[in-house]
Amino acid sequence: MSRRTRIHKRTIPPDPTFNSRLVNMMIRRIMLSGKKSVATRIIYGAFKTIEERGQDPLEVFERAVKNSTPLVEVKARRVGGATYQVPMEVRPERGVALALRWLVRFSRQRSGRSMAQKLANELMDAANETGNTIRKREETHKMAEANKAFAHYRY
């Protein structure tokens, strides 16, 4: 890795249909083997399902991401032969990335017909503060709380 210049983050363009960067990030997160059109179809299918249930899909999606974004996490840190789980605050970009990753992961684990259906159900659950994604966030917060004593090892 070169030490000369700082790497500039690329700006993700907004999604053409909903004009939202967050939706485009989710499409990229769902995509497998470069099949973006399939991922787009899954997302839009999930949004259509949410709309059929009488709710605004973009609002539900944004609420689901907001509810499942962690504020703190633990990172392993070696100090004198012992490894401590040190609680660290999560930067906003990383928090959103983790939330999207968890939403996709727990959607894939659900039993159901199509991925669009499973994603719609997971998004609805996360928006209502239930489901596996929210449980994962709570678990992460509990781990950080339990290891609060090691917060002075922060780096």
From Swiss-Prot:
It holds the Pfam family Ribosomal_S7. The keyword Signal does not apply. It comes from the Bacteria. One of its GO terms (biological process) is translation. One of its GO terms (molecular function) is structural constituent of ribosome. Keywords: Ribonucleoprotein, Ribosomal protein, RNA-binding, rRNA-binding, tRNA-binding. Gene3D superfamilies: Ribosomal protein S7 domain. InterPro entries: Ribosomal_uS7, Ribosomal_uS7_bac/org-type, Ribosomal_uS7_CS, Ribosomal_uS7_dom, Ribosomal_uS7_dom_sf. SUPFAM superfamilies: Ribosomal protein S7. One of its GO terms (cellular component) is small ribosomal subunit. PANTHER family: RIBOSOMAL PROTEIN S7. Part of the 30S ribosomal subunit. Contacts proteins S9 and S11. Belongs to the universal ribosomal protein uS7 family. One of the primary rRNA binding proteins, it binds directly to 16S rRNA where it nucleates assembly of the head domain of the 30S subunit. Is located at the subunit interface close to the decoding center, probably blocks exit of the E-site tRNA. NCBIfam families: rpsG_bact (TIGR01029). This is Small ribosomal subunit protein uS7.
